[in-house]
Swiss-Prot record:
Homodimer or homotetramer. GO terms for cellular component: cytosol. GO terms for molecular function: catalase activity; heme binding; metal ion binding. Formation of the three residue Trp-Tyr-Met cross-link is important for the catalase, but not the peroxidase activity of the enzyme. This is Catalase-peroxidase.
Length: 760
């Protein structure tokens, strides 16, 4: 792998450059904990426009609620035909022909960007790793699933320097196979093929990633310079939901925290960052060592000679950045990270050399030609053991990164590294599984995987059993609805349970949702937002109905299906009570996962900090509730109109956590009406913050001062924000009663079916 972690930063402005407790067991030779003078790459960061005339709503009104994220990636940005379906086009792909084409690229060195060691394997592994490695567990963003590495800011991050060349090398392959293979799939499949071509046996590969056509607005950190680290507080506590240690990095600084070459301090950063990618210690060691079995990093000269990144490069660069004026600027003169390291004796062959070399030598700190911190064997050991990447007559010693030495000197990592050194078969299997997880973590359930190369199902894919019974008929559905409505459960109880089951879905990494009925399992059944005591009672009643129906013989219904069906029956009843007859579409086919199929720790990150659809906000939450509502809507894949109609309808249905009356702006709770909007926008009201309850507002009659309603910021935003008010006005209108119900049902079904990839 080449330059997988090759970036550094100047000394932290927050003073966190320090050695780990107990000191470092590796000789530093008097090198300070300052960062290298030549960072990766040592070019100016993009300069945000300042002092100019405001040119956006946010410039004029910084607190303006931005809804644009709810309308990103619309069909208007795609050049593909309206009826295009990637899964159907993919079926036409000759996968073996694609593989052969990639292998040919791997072995065909191009003069405009020569291959290290005559093989682009290390470069392609790095490209795939960095595409997938942006994934983070806290909000499911990042990852390889959309081909986002093609766009800013990722295409211009310092950690992705010269990966523009890797994608350009692949362009003839993409051009040949067209829309039968997405860029998102091709980028990571090329890395997979590269590993196999260098002798590694992978765990498998699943296609199915669909391209986006515009950059995605993602919060990558608060910094406005490359390699800034304002994301820390306290004792180097990394802010959520971030994963990387510095702006513009995929993982950690390879020289050590903020350029401090301390392996033990580096281990702390590595453990935190990889955990936020859903990797445990064994997976972390396997990934780093497996990736660094291949290729090299690049620091041939002064990084000040490296030009701007792709987004800042001139038109004539045609999307390529980091043009270097050092020598030829390529081949043996390449500058990417400023670090000049080749880890193993055979950089294009899978083997166990990384660990043997790591333990075979004692290491001393040295500087690259670019001034970067790196490590070599003491006393000139290992000289002439490593080939030169471009001149077969030259040899050199093996070298390591500070982050590599962490795998030897951190006590927990050392146990794993030592075992992998002595048991190469365990290392190979661990790397195969960890690599598979890395590439597929954001692809979602196995139902989304395409192609014949898919590996054995893993628990991190949140598996659900296959359907093994006859599904319910329309008559069965009608009978079950009647049973549910006659069970004594209220509309609010049925709706809130169905919502809690389905609304855990995240469109980012396709996790959560109603399929599997994990609402009845830990950890979800104990989340405060899911009202555990009420939930237990509802589930007990529904399980009784399920048991009675299934014991009758014939068709069967899963609890996952019944929870959704029960909520839909409640919506139909509430609409009818409001004078509108409607049938909520229902498609059976969900199954029930077991606790053994559910990784409790993995699911814990899905617990919401806030859910504006339930008027729920975690105590001491600092973010604005209305901003968190938009975030929740985004994760559910909703548009602004869908978010609007759902909030209004769910308030009327009593979906608030704890039965709170905040935002229930109706005299007919439990009836599906547009009262929320009508009363919110009604003139003659005075709104003011409550003096007795935080984050609550009182709505009083302007003339009498009588308290009429209470609400939260999530409610008031639909009257305050001009864009949301325009939507609320549609649903508050006298002619909107039936439209409101229709739109609510459509949005409700969208959430209930969000994880039904089997229906796609």
């Amino acid at each position: 792998m080449t330059d997988s972690q090759d970036n550094r930063t100047p000394e932290s402005p927050q003073g966190v450059d320090r050695k780990a407790e107990g000191g470092c067991p590796v000789l530093h030779d008097g090198v300070t904990a300052q960062g290298s003078e030549s960072e990766n790459p040592a070019i100016d960061s993009p300069t945000p426009r300042t002092g100019g005339r405001p040119n956006s709503l946010k410039d004029w009104w910084p607190n303006h609620l931005d809804l644009s994220v709810l309308h990103a990636h619309s069909s208007k940005s795609s050049p593909l035909d309206p009826g295009f379906r990637y899964s159907e086009e993919f079926e036409k792909l000759d996968i073996e022909a694609l593989r052969r084409d990639i292998v040919e690229v791997l072995h065909t060195s191009q003069d405009w960007w020569p291959a290290d060691f005559g093989h682009y394997g290390g470069l392609f592994v790095r490209m795939a790793w960095h595409a997938a490695g942006t994934y983070r567990i806290h909000d499911g963003r990042g990852g390889a699933g959309q081909g986002a590495q093609r766009f800013a800011p990722l295409n211009s991050w310092p950690d992705n320097a010269n990966l523009d060349k890797a994608r350009r090398l692949l362009w003839p392959v993409k051009q040949k196979h067209g829309q039968k293979i997405s860029w998102a799939d091709l980028i990571v499949f090329a890395g997979n093929v590269a590993l196999e071509d260098m002798g590694f046996t992978t765990f498998g590969f699943g296609f199915g990633r669909e391209d986006i056509w515009e950059p995605e607005e993602i919060y990558w950190g608060p910094e406005d310079t490359w390699l800034g680290d304002e994301r820390y507080s306290g004792d180097r506590e990394l802010s959520n939901p971030l994963g990387a240690v510095q702006m513009g990095l995929i993982y950690v600084n390879p020289e050590g925290p903020n350029g401090n070459p301390d392996p033990l301090a580096s281990a702390r950063d590595i453990r935190e960052t990889f955990a936020r990618m859903a990797m445990n210690d064994e997976e972390t060691v396997a990934l780093i060592a497996g990736g660094h079995t291949f290729g090299k990093t690049h620091g041939a000269g002064d990084a000040d000679l490296v030009g701007p990144e792709p987004e800042a490069a001139p038109l004539e660069a045609q999307g390529l950045g980091w043009h270097s004026s050092f020598g030829s600027g390529k081949g043996e003169d390449t500058i990417t990270s400023g670090i000049e390291v080749t880890w193993t004796y055979h950089p294009t062959r899978w083997d166990n050399e990384f660990f043997h070399i790591l333990y075979a030598y004692e290491w001393e700190l040295m500087k690259s030609a670019a001034g970067a911190n790196q490590w070599r064997p003491k006393n000139g050991a290992g000289a002439d053991m490593v080939p030169d990447a471009h001149d077969p007559s030259k040899r050199r010693e093996p070298r390591m990164l500070t982050s590599d030495l962490a795998l030897r000197f951190d006590p927990e990592y050392a146990k794993i590294s030592s075992r992998f050194k002595d048991h190469p078969e365990e290392f190979a299997l661990a790397f195969a599984k960890a690599w598979y997880k890395l590439l597929h973590r954001d692809l979602g359930p196995i139902a989304r995987y395409l192609g014949p190369l898919v590996g054995e199902t893993q628990i991190w894919q949140d598996p659900v059993p296959a359907v093994d019974h006859e599904l319910v008929s329309d008559d069965d559905v009608a009978a079950l609805k009647a049973k549910v409505l006659d069970s004594g459960l209220s509309v609010a109880e049925l709706v809130s349970t169905a919502w809690a089951s389905a609304a855990s879905f995240r469109s980012t990494d396709k996790r959560g949702g109603a399929n599997g009925a994990r609402i009845r399992l830990e950890p979800q059944r104990s989340w405060a937002v899911n009202q555990p005591e009420q939930l237990a009672g509802v589930l007990d009643r529904l399980e009784g109905i399920q048991r009675e129906f299934n014991e009758a013989g014939g068709a069967k219904i899963s609890l996952a299906d019944l929870i959704v069906l029960a909520g839909s029956a409640a919506v139909e009843k509430a609409a009818k009570d409001g004078g509108v007859d409607v049938t909520v579409p229902f498609r059976a086919g969900r199954t029930d996962a077991s606790q053994e199929q559910t990784d409790v720790d993995s699911f814990a990150v899905l617990e919401p900090r806030a859910d504006g659809f339930r008027n729920y906000l975690l105590e001491n939450e600092k973010a604005q509730p209305e901003v968190l509502l938009v975030e929740r809507a985004y994760l559910l894949g909703l548009t602004a109109p869908e978010m609007t109609v759902l909030v209004g309808g769910l308030r009327a249905l009593g979906n608030n956590v704890g039965g709170s009356g905040h935002g229930v702006l109706t005299d007919r709770p439990g009836v599906l009406t547009n009262d929320f909007f009508a009363n919110l926008l009604a003139p003659g009201a005075q709104w003011k913050a409550s003096e007795s309850e935080a984050n609550v507002y009182e709505i009083r009659d302007l003339a009498s001062g009588e308290l009429r309603w209470t609400a939260t910021a999530v409610d008031l935003i639909f009257g305050s924000n001009s864009q949301l008010r325009s939507l609320a006005e549609v649903y508050a209108s006298a002619d909107a009663r039936e439209k409101f119900v229709r739109d609510f049902v459509a949005a409700w079904v969208k959430v209930m079916d969000a994880d039904r990839f089997d229906l796609a």
